[in-house]
Amino acid sequence: MTIFKAASPEGTRDKLFAECLRLRGIRSSLMELFSSRSYKEIMTPELEYYDLFVRAENPLPQETMFKLVDRSGRLLVMRPDCTAPIARLVASHFKDAEGPFRLCYDETVFRSAAGLDGADSELPQCGVELIGAPGLRGDIEIVSLAVDAVRSAGLRDFRLELGHADFFFGLTEELGLSREDEEALRACIESRSFALLDELVAGYSGEAAQCLRRLPYLFGGPEILDEAAALTSNPRALAAVERLRDIWRELVSAGRGDCISFDLGLVQGLDYYTGVIFRCWTPGAPSSVLAGGRYDRLLCDFGLELAGAGFAVYVGALASCFECPEPEAAKTLIFYESGCLAEAVALLGGGAELSCFATEAESLEYARRAGMKLLVVSKNGIKEVDPNV
């Protein structure tokens, strides 16, 4: 039997100094931004009941979840998503409170990456959830904060793509598609499988079918909204276009329009989202660095009629966009005599470290090998010793 003692599990890896500094810096910048916008940090357990993630609206396949059993035989999972646990938290702790609730988090989700070479199973995320703000202003707040979040991490070359779930659902509703056909159509659009898309829509005629055929091509600048509106007279789809236009106008007036584009074929996770959808891309990142949207039905599962919107920043993907130098090695070694620890500790900082050697001579030899200067702290004071003399 192979003993896996010196290796980390598939989808996980050790992270060393420079990467840790980069990740910590991004997380700190994001959480500081969220706090400045009155979002309050919460934490949910890394272990949750499996039942929380198997609702009809849940887009996460159960095979991606890490499962285990508690001592009572109940099925648990390592948290594969942050939004559903936060919905549970709101229902448990704020059921009788008046919203809106502005919540933020810095947590890790766990998803099996089996079969995906190099993919991570541990995914650090920082994100926000705005609960109880159903209208346009809630959408604007979340989308503008998403732009500011990416900028606060130091990224300048990025595109935030906006879409809307109701554009797709308005068209499929008009055609009277079954849930199975709707999901098959969504998968084709997501994967840009144009031939299969034509095949699925071939049995339908009319304006809605033609518009669905065009859906994978409806991406670009604000002119795409005009093109989309010209393709359909469906009220639900047109309302979605107008909502995107309203968000766009406000972002432009706030100086955040230069990084915005539109993708009406943005249909990932449509079982989850009910309104605006967005994700952020940047050159050099292996995947999107941020994703979010509106999910007004999620809280209904917990008996609350509250709208929700939010996003998650994928910290690992974002960190891969930056170079981070290795932390500098200590330049000063401090040897202290017995009874002088307090004085020695007061000298730490700025690239100094305490000597672990028992004698000044051993400390001097180590400092020579490491190219450090040596400070000796005694009851007579502090002296600097040149290791090379």
Question: What kind of region is each of these model predictions?
Answer:
Residues M1-A84, I140, E161:
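TRNA-binding/sensing appendages of the translation machinery
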Residues T64-D70, G176-E199, R256:
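Acidic, His- and aromatic-enriched active-site or binding-groove loops in soluble protein domains
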Residues L145-S152, D166-G176:
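Hydrophobic mid-domain F-helix/FG-region of cytochrome P450s
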